[in-house]
Amino acid sequence: MAFNLRNRNFLKLLDFTPKEIHFLLDLSAELKRAKYAGTEQKTLQGKNIALIFEKSSTRTRCAFEVAAFDQGAQVSYIGPSGSQIGHKESMKDTARVLGRMYDGIQYRGFGQEIVEVLGQYAGVPVWNGLTDEFHPTQILADLLTMQEYGRSKQLHEMKFAYLGDARNNMGNSLMVGAAKMGMDIRLVAPKAYWPNDALVATCQEIAKQTGAKITLTEEVQEGVKGCDFLYTDVWVSMGEAADAWDERVALMKPYQVNMDVIKATGNPQVKFMHCLPAFHDDQTKVGQEIAAKYGMQGLEVTEEVFESEYSIVFDEAENRLHTIKAVMVATLGQ
């Protein structure tokens, strides 16, 4: 390997250099090609991996499980009600127990400090499947998808806008990813929903070294102009109270990604991205409640955009598999 990431944790992109991130993206593309060609080599044969989920998941769980199986590893799923973590046993103690039984551990849950403790004490590679602050495996998938749809542009030549709740783990992580890779990112959101000042300052310092451009704005037209990609996420995140909806919907409605926003980019080849799940129709229980209460068909994105030729959300979702596999292979593979 050009870079030795063996035995490294993957907790947040701030811990990795641009060259290391590029290496993981290149490895992801290589593993994706091998899977399609049927030539994949099993580099995790005989490895045992624990998947800790204190928050439920579809894409992250499936991606980790299939990636592990493809590479020859065995997994143990530890769900929200399947352990004593935080109830009868601290994460520090849990880490030291699981680290003696498993070769690698994935954690999806709440505070970033929890996965940091796990990474400090486990003694084996720990991978962040999502915390309240960061979602680094998603960003790798996003960057790989942007490379695939970049029309010969390099990442540092791309412009993209994130609309909506920019203080959540996706806003934070996309800003970090853009800063690391020298990209032009616009965080388009109400000022109260911008990332915290300390993280913005950290990313601005990184941007000085990489040539990235970070813009925070409340103006949709200004923010999306000339973009190659538009990105959004749900307006109310996992674990937030139900009574947050009314205020949030009223505040975020101007930041919905609809066809007017697509056209405002001035780029007929612009692509739409979303980490999923998305509230874009009334085919779910939540979607029906939204339609009944707010008279809206879709929240953060309209059905028209979600199902349009601009949308690449399912290619993006598939890339969770390939990038997660790359992280496991790079840090644990033989």
UniProtKB/Swiss-Prot annotation:
One of its GO terms (biological process) is citrulline biosynthetic process. Coiled coil: none annotated. Pathway: Amino-acid biosynthesis; L-arginine biosynthesis; L-arginine from L-ornithine and carbamoyl phosphate: step 1/3. It comes from the Bacteria. GO terms for molecular function: amino acid binding; ornithine carbamoyltransferase activity. Carbamoyl phosphate binds at S57, T58, R59, T60, Q84, R108, H135, P136, T137, Q138, C275, L276, R320. It holds the Pfam family OTCace_N. Keywords: Amino-acid biosynthesis, Arginine biosynthesis, Cytoplasm, Transferase. GO terms for cellular component: cytoplasm. L-ornithine binds at N169, D233, S237, M238. Its main location: cytoplasm. It is found in: Cytoplasm. The keyword Transferase applies. It catalyses: carbamoyl phosphate + L-ornithine = L-citrulline + phosphate + H(+). Its EC number is 2.1.3.3. NCBIfam families: orni_carb_tr, PRK00779.1, PRK04284.1. Belongs to the aspartate/ornithine carbamoyltransferase superfamily. OTCase family. Reversibly catalyzes the transfer of the carbamoyl group from carbamoyl phosphate (CP) to the N(epsilon) atom of ornithine (ORN) to produce L-citrulline. HAMAP family: OTCase. This is Ornithine carbamoyltransferase.
